[in-house]
C-alpha cells in the first residue's frame, strides 16, 4: 500500500530488505543517515520498537513506522478513516477481541488520545513483545479504553455486543509464524486456547455492529466464513484505506507540492 501510494503521489520507491542491507553489517545510525542522503522520506517495517525509536530520533528525513512488534500506527489511521466513512464520526463503541498485540496497542493509543468513542478490549491472548502495563493503565485512566476481564467467556461478552457499533479481530498467530514448522506446536496450542473466542454468527446474534479485520484473515479461526461474507465490503474498504491514509501521511510529511 505504501509503494502504490507513493507512486500515485508521483514519487518513486526503493524497496530494501533488512537482511540484504548494510544495516546488518554497519553501525545502524550512520547507515540510516546515509539512506537519508538519497531519499526524501523513509518508511520502515521493523521487528523491534526500540529500533524504530532509535531511527526516529536520528533520521535526517521524515521517518514513518510502517509496523513493529509493539505498534502498528498506520493501520489504525486506516481504521479511523474507515470509521469516518461508515459512521461519519469517531464517536463509536468499539469491541476488540483477540490478541494483545501491535494492532491492539495502537487502537488503545488512538482512542485514549483522540478522546472520542470507547474501545473495549477482550484479550485472552498476550504477545509478550507488545505488553506495556503502564501504557494500559494510563489509557484506562482516560475513560476511553475499557479493559474487559481476559478470562471472560464469549457468552459473557455477548452482553456487550448488542451495544457495539464495531467488532474488530486480528490473527491469533503472527503471519511470519503461521506456516512455520518450527512454530507448529505453539500454533496449535494457541489456536486451541482461542477457538472459543471466534467471531461468528452465533456470537453476533442480535447485533447491529459491522465487523472489521486488518488482514490477513485466517478464516475458520478468529473469524468464521459467514461473518467474512457478510462484512467483506467493510473489510476490503478498511484494507484499501491503508493506501489512502498512508498517502495523507506522506503528503503531509513531505509538504504540498514536493511530490508534483
Language-model segments: what does each one mean?
Residues 2-84, 219:
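Phosphate/diphosphate ligand-binding glycine-rich loop within oxidoreductases
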Amino acid at each position: 500500500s505504501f509503494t502504490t501510494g507513493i507512486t500515485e503521489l508521483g514519487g518513486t520507491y526503493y524497496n530494501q530488505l533488512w537482511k540484504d542491507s548494510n544495516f546488518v553489517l554497519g553501525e545502524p545510525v550512520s547507515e540510516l543517515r546515509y539512506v537519508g542522503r538519497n531519499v526524501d522520506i523513509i518508511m520502515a517495517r521493523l521487528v523491534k520498537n526500540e529500533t524504530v525509536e532509535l531511527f526516529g530520533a536520528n533520521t535526517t528525513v521524515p521517518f514513518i513506522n510502517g509496523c513493529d512488534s509493539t505498534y502498528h500506527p498506520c493501520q489504525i489511521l486506516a481504521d479511523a478513516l474507515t470509521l469516518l466513512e461508515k459512521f461519519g464520526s469517531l464517536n463509536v463503541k468499539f469491541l476488540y477481541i483477540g490478541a494483545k498485540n501491535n494492532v491492539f496497542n495502537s487502537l488503545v493509543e488512538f482512542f485514549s488520545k483522540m478522546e472520542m468513542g470507547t474501545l473495549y478490549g477482550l484479550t485472552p491472548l498476550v504477545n509478550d513483545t507488545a505488553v506495556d502495563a503502564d501504557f494500559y493503565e494510563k489509557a484506562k485512566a482516560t475513560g476511553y479504553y475499557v479493559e474487559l476481564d481476559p478470562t471472560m467467556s464469549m457468552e459473557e461478552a455477548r452482553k456487550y455486543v448488542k451495544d457495539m457499533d464495531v467488532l474488530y479481530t486480528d490473527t491469533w498467530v503472527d503471519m511470519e509464524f503461521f506456516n512455520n514448522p518450527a512454530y507448529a506446536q505453539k500454533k496449535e496450542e494457541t489456536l486451541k486456547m482461542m477457538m472459543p473466542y471466534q467471531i461468528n454468527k452465533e456470537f453476533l446474534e442480535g447485533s447491529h455492529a459491522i465487523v472489521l479485520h486488518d488482514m490477513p484473515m485466517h478464516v475458520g479461526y478468529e473469524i468464521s466464513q459467514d461473518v467474512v461474507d457478510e462484512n467483506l465490503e467493510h473489510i476490503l474498504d478498511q484494507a484499501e484505506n491503508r493506501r489512502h491514509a498512508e498517502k495523507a501521511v506522506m503528503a503531509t510529511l513531505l509538504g504540498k507540492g514536493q511530490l508534483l
